[in-house]
A protein has these predicted regions:
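Short, glycine/charged-enriched secondary-structure capping and boundary segments
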Residues: 22-23, 41-44, 85-88, 124-128, ...
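Conserved nucleotide-binding/hydrolysis micro-motifs of P-loop NTPases
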Residues: 57, 70, 77-80, 116-118, ...
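Conserved G1/Walker A P-loop phosphate-binding module
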Residues: 1-82
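Conserved C-terminal guanine-recognition region of P-loop GTPase G domains, centered on the G4
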Residues: 93-166
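Canonical P-loop GTPase G-domain recognition
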Residues: 2-16, 145-190
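Short, well-ordered secondary-structure micro-motifs
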Residues: 19, 62, 83-84, 120-124, ...
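Conserved nucleotide-sensing/catalytic segment adjacent to the nucleotide-binding pocket
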Residues: 67-106
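Structured catalytic cores of enzymes that bind and process phosphorylated ligands/cofactors
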Residues: 33-34, 41, 62-65, 69, ...
Length: 190
């Protein structure tokens, strides 16, 4: 089992609130309402991350202390969140600061993308951040239970070609892909 203990650690609005690094971070990113908090709750095996149907609920960088050794980091959702341009700029700066300051601690960046959509510009920008900072990237396709197997095969190939990264199809509903995600996280944290 990957997560033996977990607790919410801090909701950081500024870099000064980032906790001292431990043995590594795994950060989770994606557009608003793509399912980051739901995936985290599945990995934690408890409802610790707040889930909302309202886009843009995560407005801070949320650090969860896992096994007293690592941080799983929930980045604010980007995209269509109904927030002001000023607040979006603040999020962007905070995320850029996170990458810049913790690039050596980030063991894996997990980008959740909606399997029913094509790659969005905001997803491409996140991938570029990862490439710029030399971070390992895992693409997790969410909501795959909405696709046929034939559609899913095409979508996996599309995102693999688009981002040149490992792609894992995942469904919160059926739990498809959870084992593979856990294995990939465990490998990154070795």
């Amino acid at each position: 089992m990957l997560v033996r203990s977990v607790r919410f650690f801090v909701a950081a609005r500024t870099v000064e609130q980032f906790p001292q690094p431990l043995e590594g971070d795994v950060c989770f990113a994606g557009r608003s309402n793509v399912g980051k908090s739901t995936l985290l709750n599945i990995l934690f095996n408890q409802k610790l991350a707040k889930v909302s149907k309202t886009p843009g609920k995560t407005r801070t960088i949320n650090f969860y202390l896992v096994n007293e050794r690592y941080y799983f980091v929930d980045l604010p959702g980007y995209g269509y969140a109904a927030v002001s341009k000023t607040e979006r700029r603040q999020w962007k700066k905070l995320i850029e600061d996170y990458f810049s300051l913790r690039k050596n601690e980030i063991k894996l960046s997990v980008l959740l993308v909606d399997s029913r959509l094509t790659a969005q510009e905001s997803d491409r920008i996140f991938v570029e951040y990862c490439e710029y900072y030399g971070l390992k990237l895992l693409i997790v396709l969410s909501k795959t239970d909405k696709l046929s197997e034939a559609q899913l095969k095409k979508v996996v190939q599309y995102f693999s070609d688009e981002f040149g990264s490992e792609v894992i199809p995942y469904s919160a509903l059926t739990r498809r892909g959870v084992r593979e995600i856990v294995e990939r996280l465990a490998k990154a944290l070795e």
